[in-house]
Amino acid sequence: MHHTQPSSVSITQVCETGEVYQLDEIKKISDVTHKHNLNMHMDGARFANALVSLDCSPAEMTWKSGIDVLSFGATKNGCLAAEAIIFFKKDLVGNVAFLMKRAGHLLSKMRFVSAQLDAYITNDVWLKNARRANDMGKRLSEGLNNHSDINLSYPTEANEVFATFPRNKIDHLNSEGYTINEDEWDGKAVRLVTAWNTKDNDVDEFLEILKKSN
């Protein structure tokens, strides 16, 4: 009575460590969630990156694995402030349009934001963008792995790389214009993110600068 009542379980795909939930993991979490009469939500801010990483269909990663509601993200894959809510259980829709309005998610001329999603999925642009970002993440991760004093914190499964750097390398990167936050200086993992428009030479230039700090 005096506590917030649970109504759903939410997972982030790709998750906060840059790792990807496998299909069987999503299914197991969903099964437990539904067993307790809760709804299963997926935060898909990097949905396309996860999809490319798993090489599966959108259906396999969502409703076939027990997802009830998906936040379909596009902002982190080439769009501007464009997201969509997808319900796989119609009875959950309810008054979501009113809630969106109340929460300030209906902008004036919203159609110009929404129109991006049409272009986003046409000719698999969203998957091509995600594949590029993931490939660059892998390229960066492999390059960092060549440094004995740099440790990868987690496996690189999409477009986020977490690694700890020695102070001399952080100082050198800062001097070259790559700003590393102070709270990441002393042995804490630095998050490096590659994007849909990251070029090979962007990654190679970063790695070359690191070599000069040895």
Residue ranges and their predicted role:
Residues 1-176, 184-198, 206-213:
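Conserved PLP-enzyme active-site core in the AAT-like
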